[in-house]
Amino acid sequence: MANVFDYPKEQLAELIAKTSAELLAAETAKDAVPVIKKALEKYTIFDLQRIGGNIRREVEVLPEPYRSRYRPYSQDLLTQYHAFLADVRSGKAATGAILDRELWDEFWGRAEESSFSEEVSKNAPEAGLGNPAGKFFYRLVYGYAMLIAGLPGHPVGMPFPGGWKVLEENGEILCPIRDKEKDLPQALCNYCPAIQDERCL
């Protein structure tokens, strides 16, 4: 089984296009979950090690004390990946309606363009930067987490420079950077169910 990170550009583009088309055709979460699972299972243990290594390197270059505060949240991408597969295997994965059809269609309609785009979000983990395979992995994991499970792209408690963090108040997830990347259409923040924490503007 070849590593997705080693796919030739044409093969990776074909995977992204085929997966995205199937997800655009999905009518419910029950339809979408097997498609996401199939695509994620193409990533080998070596791909996952590369993603994890990139995340660890990203953390180590951060200045203290922010580095120590951020480190416990830095593996959220892989945590969400493992949680998704565990939910699928146990039959607990979401099966209902897709939460926002318009957002879903936009998200997967942009998948190939965003994966191969050289523009990057300053808030994306290193795993999603520079390599289309990493960007697509990131999109698959958070496509389920945000647009089906309704989870925020950054976990509650995650700190940001300046002392701000993602908070949960009165049943709402408040994020200090939710609306700060609207000029980057491929930024996953634009699809997050969290709302902008107005105190951070």
Which residues fall in each region the model found?
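Cysteine-centered metal-binding/redox modules
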Residues: 14-201
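Extended, solvent-exposed polar beta/coil surface segments
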Residues: 1-8
